[in-house]
């Protein structure tokens, strides 16, 4: 998994180097701690060549840096101190990990991704409250004579544990250390958590009988992740007292194999001004706050209102903390700013994450400005763009427009993948696409849902889904969540000037994908003709030397299964797509693929 010099992670390192923001530096330090801890785990499992002792020393040093950065953050230090450590490369591929230790596949996948923790994406908190959580635990729930063993569960817990350690060092100095462990997924049961003995053995060999253990984790859902870890720790240390669990603002104890809530408070800093996502539901407040930032010189506050793109569920309001599970989740709450007098939308606002993750995402997004409406502002994790009325779906244009127009579309959108390769490339991608294991089950579920058999070539799909993409360029992208044709639009002006748009470029909730699958998804969703297929692939090939038309053709069935999986998801979530719409879309896609298959031999 050797990192490309232009990889996403080196882009992140460069961005943080240019920032003096203490929160940016703190979160990057925690991301780096996770990277080093994962590398040490791979080394101890015999699949990474780096020296264990050297990695262990560097990891201990990095954790000290995390605690210092946590103290700076909690104390309100205005400007970050010290240098930004370099991003450590990794020389492990998924195929080599699979051959030696199949259970490490999920770890290598995690290491390819810039995962947004819940605290920055969809269970928002102000991180500094975690330090107050630790002091609250000391004051109201425990009076230990020795420092507790602090264990953060990577990913989320790695951002909380240093803040606890920083608080506890006020009493115990450098003895208040912390550790992190990675919860992996069992190959035989993806819903179950797995902690490897090679990592648990790094924890203290023994502890005093009255020592407390505190596990730091994102908000527990079922509690399965922390309950499994607590069980392993109880066996390791022969515990005679309950294990504590903390997520931002919350404290639990494990009693009789269950999580019992001890305290709960809204995890927001009361000294911080109100953010947009705290104003949701109050249209006038949102509009009045944003107007000075949007450059709408002809608008008056009384004539503007904020209108949810979707309904704003009450559980997004901090006052509804009693709801379970509770989240402050702006991911679900895009909105328009609209003129009351004309009902005309003028601004569209979408949340892309807060703190370092949102800020870096916005930094990346600006590289794609050519494919965006005009960006008016970025505030509190929301990107606000000029509302663009009258856009046409690109699919409609590929189907109905003359070849001169569709060729121009292909020329225009090819630059999107160039920018993606330049800014979001990762290394060591998937030898076989993740959908390969269960693709027939997914299509079977779709057939059951629509009550029809899908027309597809079983051999072609089986060969495609098990293609090894080891020589491909891989990117971190929004594709797994935003591959529908509705994300691609265009406008042809009266003077025949073409402007193309790609919506939902942000990969805050994204994943890894090969460039072949990226292109195949675009071609399938937009019903691209064979000649345009060839033109687009050859344009992108200029930036991705290993790309071939044959490989993109081989990826088309993957795009079809990916679309089916997303349609099924939308049938179940809040959007609740109708059965009739899903039937129409699925059948058209599979029929398009069947009709295209004999023509693709000419494209090759």
From Swiss-Prot:
Please give one Gene Ontology molecular function term for this protein.
pentosyltransferase activity
Task: Please give the superkingdom of this protein's source.
Answer: Bacteria
Q: How does activity depend on pH?
A: Optimum pH is 7.5.
Pathway the protein takes part in: Antibiotic biosynthesis; butirosin biosynthesis
Supply the EC number(s): 2.4.2.49
Q: Which GO terms describe its biological process?
A: antibiotic biosynthetic process
Keywords attached to this entry: Antibiotic biosynthesis, Glycosyltransferase, Transferase
Quote the record's cofactor note: Divalent metal ion.
Catalyzed chemical reaction(s): neamine + 5-phospho-alpha-D-ribose 1-diphosphate = 5''-phosphoribostamycin + diphosphate
Q: Tell whether Glycosyltransferase is among the UniProt keywords.
A: yes
| Thermal response of activity | Optimum temperature is 27-32 degrees Celsius.
The intrachain disulfides are none
**Names of the cofactor(s):** a divalent metal cation
Q: Which residues form the signal peptide?
A: none
Described function: Catalyzes phosphoribosylation of neamine using 5-phosphoribosyl-1-diphosphate (PRPP) as a phosphoribosyl donor to generate 5''-phosphoribostamycin in the biosynthetic pathway of butirosin.
Protein name listed in UniProt: Neamine phosphoribosyltransferase
Originating organism: Niallia circulans (Bacillus circulans)
């Amino acid at each position: 998994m050797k990192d490309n010099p232009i990889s996403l992670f080196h882009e992140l390192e460069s961005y943080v180097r240019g920032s003096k923001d203490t929160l940016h530096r703190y979160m990057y330090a925690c991301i780096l701690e996770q990277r080093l801890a994962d590398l040490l785990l791979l080394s101890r499992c015999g699949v990474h060549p780096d020296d264990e002792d050297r990695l262990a020393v560097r990891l201990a040093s990095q954790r000290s840096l995390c605690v210092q950065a946590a103290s700076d953050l909690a104390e309100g230090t205005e400007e970050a101190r010290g240098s930004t450590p370099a991003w450590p490369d990794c020389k492990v591929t998924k195929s080599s990990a699979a051959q030696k230790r199949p259970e490490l596949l999920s770890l290598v996948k995690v290491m390819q991704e810039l995962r947004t923790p819940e605290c920055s994406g969809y269970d928002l908190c102000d991180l500094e409250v975690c330090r107050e959580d630790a002091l609250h635990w000391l004051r109201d729930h425990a009076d230990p004579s020795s420092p507790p063993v602090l264990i953060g569960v990577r990913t989320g817990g790695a951002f909380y544990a240093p803040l606890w350690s920083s608080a506890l060092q006020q009493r115990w100095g450098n003895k208040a250390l912390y550790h992190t462990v990675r919860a992996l997924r069992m190959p035989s049961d993806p819903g179950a958590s797995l902690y490897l003995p090679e990592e648990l053995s790094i924890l203290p060999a023994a502890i005093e009988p009255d020592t407390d253990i505190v596990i730091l984790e994102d908000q527990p859902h079922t509690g399965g992740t922390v309950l499994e870890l607590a069980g392993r720790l109880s066996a390791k240390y022969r515990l005679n007292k309950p294990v504590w669990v903390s997520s931002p603002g919350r404290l639990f104890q494990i009693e009789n194999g269950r999580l019992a809530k001890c305290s709960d408070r809204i995890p927001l800093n009361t000294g911080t001004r109100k953010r947009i996502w705290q104003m949701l539901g109050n249209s006038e407040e949102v509009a009045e706050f944003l107007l000075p930032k949007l450059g709408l010189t002809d608008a008056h506050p009384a004539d503007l209102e904020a209108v949810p793109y979707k309904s704003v569920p009450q559980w997004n309001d901090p006052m509804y903390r009693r709801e379970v599970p509770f989240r402050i989740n702006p991911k679900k709450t895009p909105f328009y700013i609209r003129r009351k007098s004309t009902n005309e939308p003028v601004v569209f606002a979408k949340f892309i994450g807060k703190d370092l993750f949102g800020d870096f995402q916005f930094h990346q997004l600006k590289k794609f400005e050519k494919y965006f409406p005009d960006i008016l502002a970025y505030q509190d994790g929301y990107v606000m763009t000029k509302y663009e009325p009258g856009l046409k779906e690109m699919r409609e244009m590929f189907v109905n427009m003359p070849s001169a127009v569709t060729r121009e579309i292909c020329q225009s959108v090819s630059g999107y993948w160039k920018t993606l390769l330049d800014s979001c490339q990762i290394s060591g991608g998937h030898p076989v696409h993740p959908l390969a294991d269960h693709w027939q089950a997914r299509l079977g579920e779709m057939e059951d849902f629509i009550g029809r058999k899908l027309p597809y070539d079983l051999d072609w799909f089986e060969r495609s889904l098990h293609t090894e993409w080891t020589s491909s360029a891989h990117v971190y992208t929004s594709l797994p969540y935003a591959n529908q044709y509705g994300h691609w639009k265009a406008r042809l002006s009266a003077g025949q000037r073409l402007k193309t748009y790609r919506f939902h470029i942000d990969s805050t909730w994204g994943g890894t994908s090969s460039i072949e699958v990226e292109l195949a998804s675009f071609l399938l969703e937009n019903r691209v003709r064979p000649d345009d297929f060839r033109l687009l692939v050859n344009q992108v090939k200029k930036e991705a030397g290993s790309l071939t038309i044959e490989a993109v053709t081989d990826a088309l069935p993957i795009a079809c299964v990916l679309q089916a999986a997303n349609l099924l998801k939308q049938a179940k979530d809040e959007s609740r797509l109708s059965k009739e719409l899903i039937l129409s879309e699925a059948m058209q896609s599979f029929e398009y693929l069947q009709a295209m298959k004999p023509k693709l031999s000419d494209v090759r």
